[in-house]
Amino acid sequence: MTTFLKSLIFLQDSCLAFLSLMFHRGSSEDAAEALKKLETSINGARISFDTTWTREFRSLFIVPLFKCLVAFCLIISLLVFIEGIYMNLVVLYVKVFERKPEKVYRWEAMQEDIELGHETYPMVLVQIPMYNEKEVLQLSIGAACRLIWPLDRLIVQVLDDSTDQTIKELVNTECAKWESKGVNIKCERRDNRNGYKAGALKEGMKHNYVKLCNYVVIFDADFQPEPDYLQHSVPFLVHNPEVALVQARWRFMNANKCLMTRMQEMSLNYHFMAEQESGSTRHAFFSFNGTAGVWRMAAMEEAGGWHDRTTVEDMDLAVRAGLLGWKFVFLNDLTVKSELPSKFKAFRFQQHRWSCGPANLFRKMIMEIIRNKRVTIWKKLYLVYSFFFLRKIIVHCFTFIFYCVILPTSVFFPEVNIPAWSTFYIPSMITLCIVIATPRSFYLVIFWILFENVMSMHRTKGTFIGILERQRVNEWVVTEKLGDALKTKLLPRIGKPSNMFLERVNSKEIMVGIYILCCACYGLFFGNTLLYLYLFMQAVAFLISGVGFVGT
């Protein structure tokens, strides 16, 4: 009705001004005055019409849509919070009641028999996949060969996919050195790199001497186990025939390399403390971390061995074995030294694989999990909802969409109320639970939050690529170890090296940073909350990442 009346007034004023202009016989000043009235009437009507139309469209469509997005994010926030509290309660239960694996499962130290001697020890195969690992090959091979285990019951298998002839010779020299000391070490090579790591592991299992082994241990080239690793882990498999996997925790030797490695340490420590510990305690299932784990050969064979259909062959094998009813044991007290990516580009590629691969595996295995009849309905629910849907998909997307899109955009919608519990209290409690895993880094919590939000953009993109199976879904990342850092590059590497400055610039981070900065400025001048303080910090984090000033 208001629009209709304004239209009538506009027509009336326009007609009067036009008639006055056409038929008025006075001076030219009067004609100019009439023309001015006509122009004013038209401009006023245009502004009135535009304002009215915009407000109505905003109130009828934009605001309700934004409210729906906020409500959806609030629901997801509660689900993430409940999941986090549940995992931490399980960990607390383990600590308070001392429910360590040694008390839950049978464990007895391996001992020699007077008559049989070493025959009481099972045959163990140690696999070390590597690709042009010049800087760490001596460390990794040496650590594997120093494992305390009868030499006649241990086989060390170096799966060398190196393309550099010099590095191949170094591997041969190192293997020959340990062979001369009595270690049964084999160096196996392929004429192709099909399947990458999964392909190398699968090919390594085809050799005749592997059939003599009962268990297989996998160490990536930058992992250095302690000599007593097998003595702590293998007894769980020997005395518990229902156990298929024993996983050790990672310990990071270069965590103090830079601020980025410190924040990675916080995230991964929480992953092991909460996700792996709670999964092992409550469901006897968790994802194999791809290294520092001991597998039962029979379980691997029953599950179908290594598959290279995704970039997370370790998780693929774990899920298939879990669906067959096999149990997994996580040893929080058993640690293996490893390294963290210290370059931002390397870390981005790694996070892409770690987010894209699980999402793609979920797409491929969802129906297989639902139709499975060998595990309980609760374990299937845990796999579908908690393990995959919530932790591997929803968390990544929610973090970016809510904290980097919805919250910044909310400054333009003062009529939409976002409760404080969703923006402050719940995130604070979740963050506190995460920081507990790394107490020494408590003072870095603000930097960790901002950095995790930046990385959530890459994880969200990787998740969608995995779910939709787009072009980069099977992109494999080779991690070249440098002794104290990791250097990552794509395979194959095509073309000439580009400008170093351009390689440091990340346009996506810069664009998101500029948008959040604009929202922060708007909130500062026109908002009535302190949200702009967070937005300014988050914008700076995106912009710093955008120009490559992260990592070494």
Swiss-Prot record:
**GO CC annotations?**
Golgi membrane
Q: Which GO terms describe its biological process?
A: cell wall organization
The active-site annotation reads D161, D314
The topology of this chain with respect to the membrane is:
Multi-pass membrane protein
EC numbers for this chain: 2.4.1.32
Please give one Gene Ontology molecular function term for this protein: glucomannan 4-beta-mannosyltransferase activity
Highest taxon of source? Eukaryota
* Locations listed in the record: Golgi apparatus membrane
Q: Which residues bind substrate?
A: D220, D222
Keywords noted in UniProt: Cell wall biogenesis/degradation, Glycosyltransferase, Golgi apparatus, Membrane, Transferase, Transmembrane, Transmembrane helix
- Catalysis: reaction(s): GDP-mannose + (glucomannan)n = GDP + (glucomannan)n+1
- List residues traversing the bilayer: 62-82, 393-413, 430-450, 509-529, 530-550
Record function comment: Probable mannan synthase which consists of a 4-beta-mannosyltransferase activity on mannan using GDP-mannose. The beta-1,4-mannan product is the backbone for galactomannan synthesis by galactomannan galactosyltransferase. Galactomannan is a noncellulosic polysaccharides of plant cell wall.
What protein family does this chain belong to? Belongs to the glycosyltransferase 2 family. Plant cellulose synthase-like A subfamily.
UniProt protein name? Probable glucomannan 4-beta-mannosyltransferase 10
- Encoding gene (name): CSLA10
